């Protein structure tokens, strides 16, 4: 017999019919349609933005501001050791990382993180390296030039 496209149908219970609201008290959601009685939220077209507290000073304005966003972090890319295998050659610099599409073109700095294995000896020029990554690079025979 076999399976045919024109004989396919959804499994039993897979498609529930939508609950029609406000269509008689026998439906279980008649009259007020599950909205309760009166008030702003019972009216059509009403939507109260999240964080609105009825006019009192909201929590996000009662609490003090703190911290800042570092502009340096916005232009510093993070590169994993495992991603370095995509680079042609054994010299790693900002230019070679951009050429291999490992970092975005607008990045000015890069930092190499310890994640994965180093496959060969790389020479790093002008790139920051974490402590763990430095140990892994030197263990593989690589070097770091500031």
From Swiss-Prot:
Residues 24-37 have a biased composition (Gly residues). InterPro entries: Ribosomal_uL15, Ribosomal_uL15/eL18, Ribosomal_uL15/eL18_sf, Ribosomal_uL15_bac-type. GO terms for molecular function: rRNA binding; structural constituent of ribosome. One of its GO terms (cellular component) is cytosolic large ribosomal subunit. Gene3D superfamilies: 3.100.10.10. It comes from the Bacteria. The keyword Ribosomal protein applies. Keywords: Ribonucleoprotein, Ribosomal protein, RNA-binding, rRNA-binding. GO terms for biological process: translation. Residues 1-55 are annotated as: Disordered. The keyword rRNA-binding applies. SUPFAM superfamilies: Ribosomal proteins L15p and L18e. Part of the 50S ribosomal subunit. Belongs to the universal ribosomal protein uL15 family. Binds to the 23S rRNA. This is Large ribosomal subunit protein uL15. It comes from Psychrobacter cryohalolentis (strain ATCC BAA-1226 / DSM 17306 / VKM B-2378 / K5). The gene is rplO.
């Amino acid at each position: 017999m076999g399976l045919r496209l024109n004989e396919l149908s959804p499994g039993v219970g897979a498609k529930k019919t939508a609950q029609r609201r406000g269509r008689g008290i026998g439906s279980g959601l008649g009259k007020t349609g599950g909205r309760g009685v009166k008030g702003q939220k019972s009216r059509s077209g009403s939507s109260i933005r999240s964080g609105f507290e009825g006019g009192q000073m909201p929590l996000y304005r009662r609490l003090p501001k703190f911290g800042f966003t570092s502009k340096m972090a916005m232009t510093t890319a993070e590169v994993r050791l495992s991603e370095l295998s995509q680079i042609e050659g054994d010299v790693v610099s900002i230019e070679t990382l951009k050429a291999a599409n490992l970092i975005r073109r607008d990045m000015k700095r890069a930092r190499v993180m310890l994640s994965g294995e180093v496959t060969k000896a790389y020479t790093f020029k002008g790139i920051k390296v974490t402590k763990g990554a430095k140990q892994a690079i030197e263990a593989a025979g690589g070097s770091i030039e500031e």
